[in-house]
Amino acid sequence: MKNLYLFLSIFILTISTSFADGHNIKKDGFLSKKFKVTKLSIIEDPTNKIILINNHGQSNFDGKQNFCTSIDQIRNRVSLVGEQINGKKIMLYNLCAHKIEGDMGKKWWFSKKPYEGKSKLDKRVEQNLELVEKLVSLGVPRKQIFVTGHSCGGLTTLLFFSRHPDKAGGGIAYMQACFDRLSKKYKVSKLGLEEGLAKFKEKKPAQYDLRSQYNDEILKNLKVPLLAFTHPKDPFEGLTSDWLDQIDGMKRVVISKDYTIDGKKCFKLGKNKSDKFKVKDGHSMDQATCFQYYNPVILELSLIHI
């Protein structure tokens, strides 16, 4: 069993490193167009700022990891920095949660025990609330603060607004997921949603139950107009996300059916433009430069709220 844990840890680390493209970001702060991180202190002219909070993904469900995000993962969010809406300038705050650990830790994923205590997702919701309150104390109006996130960060975003609907202006969930590659592993495209999720429940009952608990909470309590981006070839929740359409006010965008947007092939870029590689996984489509096609949709969300 110890060898299995060792193998899985190395495997996850390898996957994380390949996604990182060698340009990891390991600290909180505002990001400039050149990916320079500035710590939160005083915000100049805060009433004329729009703050986007970025919640990164995770390399495991409940444990710590080596870094929070990377240049290739956050490039599209940075592309919005400096844009203005009604005279209000957009800033991007990268919120790192890589040092946070849930009460049951990384090993819970391999357990059949029901989850007890606060998960990493729960703690990330609290972390976001703390940051929002700090920004408000510095003079930024709540309606001009937007919580956003990719993958586990996307699910964090949905949970945040289901628990704290009046604390921020709005949010964006990119490829919300935190419970493994459900679509691919349980062959949802072949077996269908119901049978695929039944197999997930049979293999990982505790994890199935916690996912259901979170989804039910979101369906019941989420009332704030949000954006959600999904992709059918996302191996995580690409074919298991139709439940989002049941949420009043939710604007769900299914990005495309393949790895193109508006007829253009999609690539990810690292620190240098020469660090270019094709997108081969629908889970990363929101990180491909072609995704900037949707920047006007994202800016429109901000305009509606301010």
Where is each model-derived feature located?
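The feature captures the conserved acid-bearing segment of alpha/beta-hydrolase catalytic domains
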Residues: 178-256
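Alpha/beta-hydrolase active-site loop
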Residues: 112-138
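Short, surface-exposed "cap/lid" segments of acyl-processing enzymes
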Residues: 43-85
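Cap/lid segment of the alpha/beta-hydrolase catalytic domain
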Residues: 92-122
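N-terminal cap/lid segment of alpha/beta-hydrolase-fold proteins
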Residues: 21-45
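Active-site-adjacent alpha-helix of alpha/beta-hydrolase-fold enzymes
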Residues: 69-81, 230-272
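Primarily recognizes the serine-hydrolase "nucleophile elbow" in alpha/beta-hydrolase
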Residues: 134-137, 143-192
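C-terminal catalytic histidine-bearing segment of alpha/beta-hydrolase fold enzymes
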Residues: 251-303
